[in-house]
């Protein structure tokens, strides 16, 4: 694994509020190695641990990107949907930022069928084919297209299972995380003080509620992937 300087500074993390955990009564004891202290009933994360693990995660995705690996970013909470799209587009990653369809990965054959249907409908819409259909039939197809785009738009060019998944919230994306675990897909996940770090391959201790925190972490990972892609090996 190639080590690089990703400018993961404590001041930047503090300004982004990455160190703020949940109230002390809402915690998972497995997170104790990553907790620095408590303040006014709130756990404060140890940012030196966050810096170490985020740096390791950046090194990992950089090396994977150099090898031409594919990434999937997942974040479906309202406050992060646009952040997921932004980070994914910057780093040419696939993403899910709306509803996660159960079986998206574990039932990949069905997902491929849905993707083909989505692409067929999208092409038909682009060519104006809906305009030549009866209104009721056109409305049904347009409704299907909207629903499929919401769930599959970010993975429409994903031709196979991803090599690495980046997940922003362990609880919100528990099904996605479980599917990755079943399939042996390595996961990088932000873990707040109420999370179980044992459920992910590379935990990044951090505030998984604040936009500023999630954006800061995603930006670092997206930068590492982008730099890796610019150094991609040609075989």
Swiss-Prot record:
Pfam families: Ribosomal_S2 (PF00318). SUPFAM superfamilies: Ribosomal protein S2. CDD domains: RPS2. It is found in: Plastid, Chloroplast. Keywords: Chloroplast, Plastid, Ribonucleoprotein, Ribosomal protein. One of its GO terms (molecular function) is structural constituent of ribosome. InterPro entries: Ribosomal_uS2 (IPR001865), Ribosomal_uS2_bac/mit/plastid (IPR005706), Ribosomal_uS2_flav_dom_sf (IPR023591). The keyword Plastid applies. GO terms for cellular component: chloroplast; mitochondrial small ribosomal subunit. GO terms for biological process: translation. NCBIfam families: rpsB_bact (TIGR01011). Belongs to the universal ribosomal protein uS2 family. This is Small ribosomal subunit protein uS2c. It comes from Adiantum capillus-veneris (Maidenhair fern).
